Amino acid sequence: MKVWGAHGEFCARHQWEVIVATLALLACAASVERNGPGNRSEHCAGWARACPGLEAEYQAADAVIMTFVRCAALLYAYYQISNLHKIASKYLLIIAGVFSTFASFIFTSAVASLFWSELASIKDAPFLFLLVADVARGARMAKAGWSAGEDQGKRVGRALALLGPTATLDTLLAVLLVGVGALSGVPRLEHMCTFACLALLVDYLVFVTFYPACLSLVADFASGRKEMSPDSPFSEADLKPNPVVQRVKMIMAAGLLCVHLTSRWPWSSDNGIIEGPTDTLTPTSNDNILLHSYVKWFSVSADYIVIATLLCALIIKFVFFEEQRNWVIDMNDMTVKEVVQEQARSKPKFSVGDDSNSEVSTQTEGVLEDEWPTLSPSSSAAKLNSKKRPMAECLEIYRSEGACVSLSDEEVVMLVEQSHIPLHRLEAVLGDPLRGVRLRRKVVGARFQTELAIKQLPYLNYDYSKVLNACCENVIGYVGVPVGYAGPLVVDGKPYMIPMATTEGALVASTNRGAKAIGIRGVTSVVEDVGMTRAPAIKLPNVVRAHECRQWIDNKDNYAVIKEAFDSTSRFARLQEIHIGVDGATLYLRFRATTGDAMGMNMVSKGAENALKLLKNYFPDMEVISLSGNYCSDKKAAAINWVKGRGKRVVCETTITSDSLRTIFKTDAKTLARCNKIKNLSGSALAGSIGGNNAHAANMVTAIYIATGQDPAQNVTSSNCSTNMEVCGENGEDLYVTCTMPSLEVGTVGGGTILTGQGACLDILGVKGAGARPAENSARLASLICATVLAGELSLMAALVNSDLVKSHMRHNRSTVNVQVQAENITLKVPTL
């Protein structure tokens, strides 16, 4: 397996080298001189002239057998195309068919012409390739090569590691089986079988060398295109062979090998040559020659009439009568199970706009999947269709295996309903996250009578392996949030497209308008890595002991001991400060530490816990009340975060010219500065706001948080922002704007950043993963968020002074259902006095 994987990865990573080398060998084989003096065959003059040895082609047995072979090839090709149409998208069908049939045909013809010139030009070669080509194997390879996850080379290598041994055994068995035809004694069939054996061998070599390289190359060119991705999720179970079938194939191969050894025994006849008289047909008259020609023409015509009729029938059936359905394929045994889908269509009418009476009609289609029973990647059709076994037997299988891989979906649900399997552990027990989510949806829907509602919640085409034990539990699906972009927004001299995930209309458009006003001048930012905090609450017997404990911690030498214990828990967490709050005999130890590119809550909690264990050695009478005493303060509006900071402290500034204010915002600097003072400063102070001296910073913060996999609940603290506006410039017509955000809690590793979509948004910003220096990427993300907040603040303030807020929300954020028809039938009763 490792050898196959390494070979496949090599071919995928050295695409051009493998392709060029293969084509070079093809060119060499095609250019070799084959027509030597003794190899040129004699041709007969005239189509009606009888030639020696030619009559064998028109023997009755020969014609019947060849017609049967050609028809079988057409039927098998039709079967292959039908199955491929169900396996995946039409693109996999095209690529697998081209590379498995056309490439192998070209290479086999070149090799055959090099060694056996009489085999290279046989007219039944296309039928042979239809009969021996395994297009489904190429489709499986393509589906695995385009699955999500590792890089292209590793995906192709893993697929070849799973398919390589099976392909080797299948090729060996096919060569031995087809080789039996070479012992039939029918000349044409012998030639065809010899050519077919050669075709199988060359097709195998193309599959393990040329095909992986081409597949990797096509995948690189088509990366990011939705239509080129597989229609159903890929699982390694799709490629794993059935061990029982493999053993049967090995037994068959051994038996066929014995047949070949017996039939081809070298001393079965003298010199292995069967001698016999050679009959030649000598025409006696022109009438006999003409009659013989008619007979030959009729036999050939009858042969092709049968084949043409069959081919036309198959084409008509496939094009006009083939029913288009959705199928799910078990890739192990090519068993098909139909999945019927309900389609619910509704056509609501919406009125959108200001005073316009025009109606915008939209049609939405909701697809409700019929989930029971569905063929999952890890369960076979036999398991789904088999009779449900008794509870005791299923329970014994589950306890003996420690898993439910061999149980059907109905049997697993039965164990869940009887409380033998916890509902939250389905993914771990089944070993298949997607199947676990699907069965949980079934159980929850039946238990709470919400089947129809759950069916409307999407769950397919999502990598739940990244969610498990990292982001969410009891998963039943996912909610798609639209992601828009604002920009380009120039920050510190570099333009960025800012991804924002939101369902609030006008937010992205408003932020984009602010970015346009900022223009090429851009935003200048400064970032300070304050560090994440955690504040355990500890209690001492009395205030004297509490005072002694506080003094002990404040001592520099003792602090160094605590810092060493704290820092030992992580490669990145580094303790910066212990700020102590006192309430009677209770101490609140606010540990503040830098955490690299991670947001760092878990790091700081782990370090604080280890520091408390050390402190317990010096103060045995100390009691740990809680690892978090709300003095941190996490996910709550608190002045301590506003004053001392938490996470990243960011300050951004920019200057908007008077021209931009007039043309884009339709206002001036004095108006905006006056509104900012009255609204953001005086109004927030009158309301007693903590860190709320801004227009709507939380909007931009939360939208970017959702898009980039941050903790959305952290927006409570992270949205602390002070927006200031001042007039500036020679004539006092320009506007100087600053945004100060002292507690932006962000990270580019861990948490939701590991998910595919969120990671893509981080990649758009160029801050995915850990930076070259600790906290480099997280600090850059914090500065981009603050700059986006500044752009959004500008746009909203301009909309407020121009009374554009309601108008823009009516246009972008308010879709009113047309209730005119319902309103006509409303009767209003007015009570009499």
UniProtKB/Swiss-Prot annotation:
Activity regulation information from UniProt: The activity of HMG-CoA-reductase is suppressed by exogenous mevalonate.
Subcellular localization(s) per the UniProt record: Endoplasmic reticulum membrane
GO biological process: coenzyme A metabolic process; isoprenoid biosynthetic process; sterol biosynthetic process
Transmembrane segments: 10-32, 91-117, 160-180, 301-321
Region (Catalytic): 420-833
UniProt pathway: Metabolic intermediate biosynthesis; (R)-mevalonate biosynthesis; (R)-mevalonate from acetyl-CoA: step 3/3
Region Disordered: start-end pairs: 347-374
InterPro entries xrefs: HMG_CoA_Rdtase (IPR002202), HMG_CoA_Rdtase_cat_sf (IPR023074), HMG_CoA_Rdtase_CS (IPR023076), HMG_CoA_Rdtase_eu_arc (IPR004554), HMG_CoA_Rdtase_N (IPR023282), HMG_CoA_Rdtase_NAD(P)-bd_sf (IPR009023), HMG_CoA_Rdtase_sub-bd_dom_sf (IPR009029), HMGCR/SNAP/NPC1-like_SSD (IPR053958)
Catalytic EC class: oxidoreductase
Membrane topology: Multi-pass membrane protein
One cellular component term from this protein's GO annotations in UniProt: peroxisomal membrane
Reaction(s) catalysed by this chain's protein: (R)-mevalonate + 2 NADP(+) + CoA = (3S)-3-hydroxy-3-methylglutaryl-CoA + 2 NADPH + 2 H(+)
Region (Linker): 322-419
Polar residues bias: start-end ranges: 354-365
Function per UniProt: Synthesis of mevalonate for the production of non-sterol isoprenoids, which are essential for growth differentiation.
Family as reported in the entry's similarity comment: Belongs to the HMG-CoA reductase family.
Protein name listed in UniProt: 3-hydroxy-3-methylglutaryl-coenzyme A reductase
Upper classification of the organism: Eukaryota, Metazoa, Ecdysozoa, Arthropoda, Hexapoda
